[in-house]
Design a protein with these regions (language model features):
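Intrinsic-disorder-associated, low-complexity terminal segments enriched in Asp/Asn/His/Tyr and depleted
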Residues: 3-4
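Active-site pocket-lining/capping segments in soluble small-molecule metabolic enzymes
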Residues: 12, 16-132, 153, 160-323
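Conserved nucleotide-cofactor-binding alpha/beta core module
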Residues: 137-138
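Acidic-histidine catalytic/liganding microenvironments
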Residues: 146
Length: 323
């Protein structure tokens, strides 16, 4: 493989630098990720945050906010749940709390939350996160214009051929998942519990139970599934790893990378974060090469959980295959 170097370029000047957001499963891991030099920490609590490695208490979120800001970094808190009316009735005290601890961003996907934020004059910056539904530049621009959204989380099912067209129209920065488990379906219904009831099975439904679905025609397929107070969550067959695609992403304006640790617990996730930080620094210095990308990618594969597999997801798909 030829050792080509690349020049750092961020399309349309959306971001002055590459931003790495990482999830966290504990206060100790927050400290380790800050030491690793990630830019943002992504956390939340049980009632309003979806698919988090850990549900923190309000006291823990306060402590995390202090740690993040003392390190000169930013805090994003998940408020991206699909809301029922009773959740909306109780959301104001939580938004008050997030403003009090000075959360830098909150992720929001429900129109009702945007309404409350605007109606009551909250100063919280928002990131539009409607999961698998965020596939259109114009959709994102709508929320930027009408709800004051600062950034957006892109769906993971967008092929690169379609992805690279988006910055020409996008008016705000967009986050791309570059590592970790990728959700492909969320239902508010208790699908696992319904299955257990039908089959008379008594079993756990949690993420830690490590349940998965397999296609009848492909017994090797592995779609992770778990159920919690927000319903049922199903994930892609393989986890995502875009280390070898980072230069392409940056050169097309995608300078906000997300690292998802939902199925990569403990120290290994921190080590993987360090690898992406190294890639970020090399790219920004104009010293990143295809050989380095290959070496770093191999290191990620060694740290990734042995019972899970990595690929580039929909990145190289023909757009006609996913319409």
């Amino acid at each position: 493989m030829k050792n080509h170097s690349f020049i750092f370029f961020c399309y349309n000047g959306f971001m002055k630098k590459i931003i790495i957001t990482a999830t966290a499963e504990s206060i100790e891991q927050v400290e380790e990720l800050l030491e690793a030099d990630v830019d943002r920490i992504y956390v939340g609590e049980k009632n309003y945050g979806l698919r988090l490695p850990h549900n923190f208490s309000l006291d823990e979120l306060t402590r995390i906010s202090d740690l993040v800001h003392q390190a000169g970094k930013e805090l994003t808190v998940a408020v991206n749940a699909l809301m029922h009316q009773e959740m909306m009735d109780k959301i104001k005290p939580y938004l008050d709390f997030l403003q009090e601890i000075e959360a830098d961003y909150i992720t929001v996907g429900d129109a009702g939350v945007f309404y409350v934020l605007q109606r009551d004059g909250y100063k919280l910056k928002t990131i539009y996160d409607a999961s698998t539904m965020v596939t259109s530049s114009r959709q994102i621009n709508f929320w930027a214009k009408n709800a004051g959204v600062s950034e957006a989380v892109l769906a993971r099912e967008i092929p690169s051929a379609e992805l690279f067209k988006m910055p020409e129209i996008l008016e705000i920065p967009a986050e791309v998942l570059v590592y970790g488990a990728s959700v492909i379906h969320h239902s508010k219904r208790p699908l696992l519990q319904n299955y257990y009831n039908f089959t008379h099975i008594d079993d756990e439904k949690t993420r830690e139970r490590d349940l998965f679905l397999a296609e009848p025609s492909d017994p090797q397929s592995h779609y992770s599934i778990f159920e919690d107070n927000h319903g049922t969550h199903i994930f892609a067959n393989n986890d995502l790893d875009l280390m070898t695609k980072l230069i392409e992403l940056v050169n097309h304006g995608f300078c906000h990378w997300k690292l998802e640790g939902l199925y990569t617990p403990g120290h290994n996730f921190v080590e993987i974060a360090k690898i992406f930080v190294e890639a970020r620094d090399l790219i920004e210095a104009g010293k990143f090469s295809s050989d380095q990308a290959f070496v770093l990618d191999e290191a990620i594969h060694k740290l990734h959980p042995k019972n899970r597999f990595l690929d580039t997801g929909f990145y190289d798909y023909d757009p006609d295959m996913v319409k």
